Amino acid sequence: MERPRGAADGLLRWPLGLLLLLQLLPPAAVGQDRLDAPPPPAPPLLRWAGPVGVSWGLRAAAPGGPVPRAGRWRRGAPAEDQDCGRLPDFIAKLTNNTHQHVFDDLSGSVSLSWVGDSTGVILVLTTFQVPLVIVSFGQSKLYRSEDYGKNFKDITNLINNTFIRTEFGMAIGPENSGKVILTAEVSGGSRGGRVFRSSDFAKNFVQTDLPFHPLTQMMYSPQNSDYLLALSTENGLWVSKNFGEKWEEIHKAVCLAKWGPNNIIFFTTHVNGSCKADLGALELWRTSDLGKTFKTIGVKIYSFGLGGRFLFASVMADKDTTRRIHVSTDQGDTWSMAQLPSVGQEQFYSILAANDDMVFMHVDEPGDTGFGTIFTSDDRGIVYSKSLDRHLYTTTGGETDFTNVTSLRGVYITSTLSEDNSIQSMITFDQGGRWEHLQKPENSKCDATAKNKNECSLHIHASYSISQKLNVPMAPLSEPNAVGIVIAHGSVGDAISVMVPDVYISDDGGYSWAKMLEGPHYYTILDSGGIIVAIEHSNRPINVIKFSTDEGQCWQSYVFSQEPVYFTGLASEPGARSMNISIWGFTESFLTRQWVSYTIDFKDILERNCEENDYTTWLAHSTDPGDYKDGCILGYKEQFLRLRKSSVCQNGRDYVVAKQPSICPCSLEDFLCDFGYFRPENASECVEQPELKGHELEFCLYGKEEHLTTNGYRKIPGDRCQGGMNPAREVKDLKKKCTSNFLNPKKQNSKSSSVPIILAIVGLMLVTVVAGVLIVKKYVCGGRFLVHRYSVLQQHAEADGVEALDTASHAKSGYHDDSDEDLLE
């Protein structure tokens, strides 16, 4: 990967304990767009799709606080008045449900994946590798559990004791297909690669020799797990229709490929040299029949990706080194130019989040600044409004703290870079309409970064802090079925501090916070929020876990092992419905180290199933109970049935969040600022951008030039409000034609037939006509981005798929996207 720019180089200065971003002098690197949106949060009734796993190296945990103390205690300022009494007989109950497994294994790393949802099947792959002068020696072991990690069986013989390539991971099939693919190491002279396939939840494996050497992990079609996609080391695109038993190369010179809806495949191809050499001159193709026929849907492509129902492409502008985002909602048959600033060679785009209603887009600022601007789209993904200035995003390949709080709709948390280079956290409760600082926790004091010791706010540590090697073991955590709960490391002051953080919890989706635990911890949520488990982050061996049955108000300590272990990971089944937690680590003696896991089942702590009177009604987003609009966000309010903190009972695996929505009348809070307007900080009204005053707002929409008359507001995509305020907004057709030529697909290709000559002649005539129109209209509509004049393109260009537009990926566990820079190297 290319060398990160600016702040991503990791050089920091720390005056007054602030986390600051240092400006660097070396020239900036070329930007890489990141156009793949992170996958949406899981639905209330989890249907896990795709590999979800954890991977740890053989190492001790990073330095942390003291060894956890035993006993019970209460955090400050609890939300309910209660004593932290000791749970009856909890030590005996947990002791009877603690299962140790010692692995007779000296491997240097462990990878863990769940196979299916609620199946109890876990695969563990250990690897040991010693690099020699020319070749490397290694071995792998594969273990399987079918009781959530309480017991493991060595099944290495099922893969013929073959060394498995860990860079490909364990490719787990979608839904509960039970499919698993492991990619094996082969000798240098082999004609192709080798995989081991299982379709029965890893009970059996079949060895398959490939006619190619894979470059990437096998990609399952979301609609049919028998359909697989793979890129070869020679840039060939290969497809299998029978779960990898047989393969067919459907195209050569492919740079990037992705599955779209309905088994559509989108891919970019180079025509002159290589993927890197042709970056910005790639072609985007689509096949809807697994490679029988093809259609070129875009040219001059820099990168592309998928998010929600949108297909995005980063496209080079004519006679320029800038590029623009184009959007399609019909798999690339027609395209529209997004009303966003163009970016130069050293900048990037990044899709932070996308769903069927809207897109969060980060646009990098010119220069080596380490920040950019967040824009939010309309429901077409075309017209964008400025949402947040100075958004921290260090570089292509760098990190952003942008976090979707999945436990409450409309809530996102991220970081901004202040003028003094300090980093501050911001939160939005209305999907980017307004951002504000996080409230100071009631049971916390302002730290040394605060100018006023009585006025400060909470600042959240996320991906950027982790990338800078601060003492932050985990990113913020929330789960869709644990309504309102958010857990995160943070500091309380005027900006993020480099001092040792504490752990904070919110039970209302981020409106209010309380210190939950002192010092850094690992944490996870079980039983849809019924239990929270934590382990202190320490460089010493540990044997104590903490758990809470009342959303972090009171904590119990449990010694899970007489012999402390070097802790490496805390694992629970994705979806937060499980009652089991696995603690992974290793023990070491003078000459040896051994992997060990402890799986603890909390089923006897929550002995009874929850009943109706264990739940209480809770109005989400409630800030002013006396106001009839209280709780109205995005046009409606929601009342939830939530577990009482005092109830010690089990929600169960089949728990479904119960909620009752009701429509609200429209108010200013239901509107974003329209194109050309913005909301000043801490203001509710939109004001016109100074540089736009007196200018006519004209744009090109689907080939027609139109005039926009607006009072500065447009409804938030997905907002359901009815009646009430309705700011005037009118789009008038000026009866003038316009076009844009950034995307210009020239041909439709088929394996079975060539394009007739007569169609080529007709196409040439059409191109000539279009070129004439473009010359006439070049400065009227389209072309380079203007602040007060914007252009929308309709052309037969690209297909659905926006992954990895310009920026770097977030996380590497299946919840974030790959970047072009990763795939082009």
UniProtKB/Swiss-Prot annotation:
Query: What's the source species' lineage?
Result: Eukaryota, Metazoa, Chordata, Craniata, Vertebrata
Listed A to Z, the keywords are:
Cell membrane, Cleavage on pair of basic residues, Developmental protein, Differentiation, Disulfide bond, Endocytosis, Endoplasmic reticulum, Endosome, Glycoprotein, Golgi apparatus, Lipoprotein, Lysosome, Membrane, Nucleus, Osteogenesis, Palmitate, Phosphoprotein, Receptor, Repeat, Signal, Transmembrane, Transmembrane helix, Transport
For the motif DXXLL motif involved in the interaction with GGA1, what are the positions?
820-824
Query: Topology relative to the membrane, per the entry?
Result: Single-pass type I membrane protein
Q: Which residues carry this modification: Phosphoserine?
A: S809, S813, S819
Q: Which residues form the propeptide?
A: 32-73
Q: List all annotated glycosylation positions.
A: N96, N160, N272, N404, N580, N682
Pfam families assigned to the protein according to its UniProt record, in alphabetical order: Sortilin-Vps10, Sortilin_C
**Major location category of this protein:** Golgi
* KW 4Fe-4S (keyword) present: no
Looking at the keywords, is Disulfide bond present?
yes
Q: Which of the residues are on side Cytoplasmic? A: 776-825
Give its localization.
Golgi apparatus, Golgi stack membrane; Endosome membrane; Endoplasmic reticulum membrane; Nucleus membrane
Q: Which residues are on the Extracellular side of the membrane?
A: 74-754
Q: Which InterPro entries match?
A: Sortilin_C, Sortilin_N, VPS10, VPS10-sortilin, WD40/YVTN_repeat-like_dom_sf
- Gene coding for it: Sort1
Where is the region Golgi to endosome transport and interactions with GGA1 and GGA2? 777-825
Q: What protein does this entry describe?
A: Sortilin
What biological function has been recorded for the protein in this entry?
Functions as a sorting receptor in the Golgi compartment and as a clearance receptor on the cell surface. Required for protein transport from the Golgi apparatus to the lysosomes by a pathway that is independent of the mannose-6-phosphate receptor (M6PR). Lysosomal proteins bind specifically to the receptor in the Golgi apparatus and the resulting receptor-ligand complex is transported to an acidic prelysosomal compartment where the low pH mediates the dissociation of the complex.
The protein's GO terms of the molecular function aspect are:
enzyme binding; G protein-coupled neurotensin receptor activity; nerve growth factor binding; nerve growth factor receptor activity; neurotensin receptor activity, non-G protein-coupled; retromer complex binding
Organism the protein comes from: Rattus norvegicus
GO cellular component terms, A-Z: cell surface; cerebellar climbing fiber to Purkinje cell synapse; clathrin-coated pit; clathrin-coated vesicle; cytoplasmic vesicle; cytoplasmic vesicle membrane; cytosol; dendrite
Cite the repeat ranges for BNR: 143-154, 196-207, 238-249, 285-296, 326-337, 375-386, 426-437, 504-515, 546-557
